[in-house]
């Protein structure tokens, strides 16, 4: 590991807005039994009727989990705080729940040095909890808010395990407690029951805090009615890897599951987790980047069949930390399993959105799923997409059902001034050299010039606006003069004030057959490499050009080996999901 320091991404809270209208009293009913509730509605949403000053605070409760992640012979307990409205004795309230590894802050820990050689496969060629805006907004509207510290963090027991079953079960235990299936205790050891709750729980959060709802939903736990994952991970492999390549979350070069766990390891006596960290280091297999059992246990997409809660996905189309593949594959899997769902895709980066009446929409969603209020939220089109001009577009599904995969043979612009050469011409061969120290924004500039470290392919000038919705893919046939390299494809919008990298994708050529196994690459031998870029929903304006830039290493994301590897490209094509 290098001496560099890292700061892991933090979660965000949500703003609050109140809209006036008429009022009414309602009662919500669970299948098993009737629960008395007392709320009032305005515009189909709960309105604030409970005093925040009189709210009941249950601080420093400890919920007993099913796991012993620190292997001390005792079940881990997770620390939570509860804020709920002061109600009549027989009135029950549902719960909005956020679990987080970040509440007690982050430690500065070393990250991996990425300025190093790639590994060649040897084989025969073939902080204090603040209930904040959740509590301020929802408690007066008849909700309890629970904020927890995940295993190994803050006042909780155990060790952080970066997304595996132990972390999932530790988070799930709070829902079990709310429904009478787990025990919780005060600091003095007195048992506490959640007899004030209807048992209906909605989980939410941003980033890691939004990832845990995805994970817990795959357990099918009873009582979890809905989740709102914002900028959330659905598969940890795709957070730290891509098609066999070791890939960094945007802005956090050198981060991986082990130093992530070290950064959030804020419990007392953190040294007891030393063995757990070592197991993370071994399991993540940073050397090959292959998908293995370690990553499979942290893949929630494959377990979408177990999800019983509804899901409201929120993600930024320009999120290069938790990249867009995370929402796209999760959304697809949920649809395949008929999970009730809704999605907002905004133009921001890593985080949520406050535009498009977000707070009111979230309020209605929670009211529908936790109080059973018929407010029309499920009658809306499933997907809202924010366009580049900040307006919002409603569509039936995502990718847009009108998107058609279109195979395109591009035009090479930087090898011939007078005669564009078809990328698909069998008798044409083009080469470029890897230099990992040159950043991608430099490599996409001036597409008309010949640059040794890239190939630029451009389409003719667009005669009309052209929208993509889905996952671009690229396929190239060619060879490498070494047994190891990176491969990177950049989809670029040419024609504005400066080139804009719309999306990108990476591959380890040694994973030419699968992400599970590396294949030894024979220098000079032709292979066909096919890989995906990150999904997107983007409009190329009329008068612009769509470009594909091929490079080897990507400074901000890949391992950065020594310069000089030569890549030769012969036949290639790109497939774009173009909306007709």
UniProtKB/Swiss-Prot annotation:
**Catalytic activity entry:** Hydrolyzes Xaa-Pro-|- bonds to release unblocked, N-terminal dipeptides from substrates including Ala-Pro-|-p-nitroanilide and (sequentially) Tyr-Pro-|-Phe-Pro-|-Gly-Pro-|-Ile
Looking up SUPFAM superfamilies in the UniProt record yields: alpha/beta-Hydrolases, Galactose-binding domain-like
> NCBIfam families given for it?
PRK05371.1-1
Q: What is the active site of this protein?
A: 207, 319, 350
Quick one: signal sequence residues?
Answer: none
Kindly provide the name given to this protein in its UniProt entry.
Answer: Putative Xaa-Pro dipeptidyl-peptidase
EC number(s) of the enzyme?
Answer: 3.4.14.11
Mind telling me which Pfam families this protein's record contains? Peptidase_S15, PepX_C
Q: Name one GO molecular function term.
A: dipeptidyl-peptidase activity
* Family named by the database record: Belongs to the peptidase S15 family.
Q: Which domain of life is it from?
A: Bacteria
**Alphabetized InterPro entries for the sequence:** AB_hydrolase_fold, Galactose-bd-like_sf, Pept_S15_Xpro, Xaa-Pro-like_dom, Xaa-Pro_dipept_C
SMART domains recorded: PepX_C (SM00939)
Instruction: Report keywords, A-Z.
Output: Aminopeptidase, Hydrolase, Protease, Serine protease
Entry's Gene Ontology BP terms: proteolysis
Q: Which organism is it from?
A: Bacillus cereus (strain ATCC 14579 / DSM 31 / CCUG 7414 / JCM 2152 / NBRC 15305 / NCIMB 9373 / NCTC 2599 / NRRL B-3711)
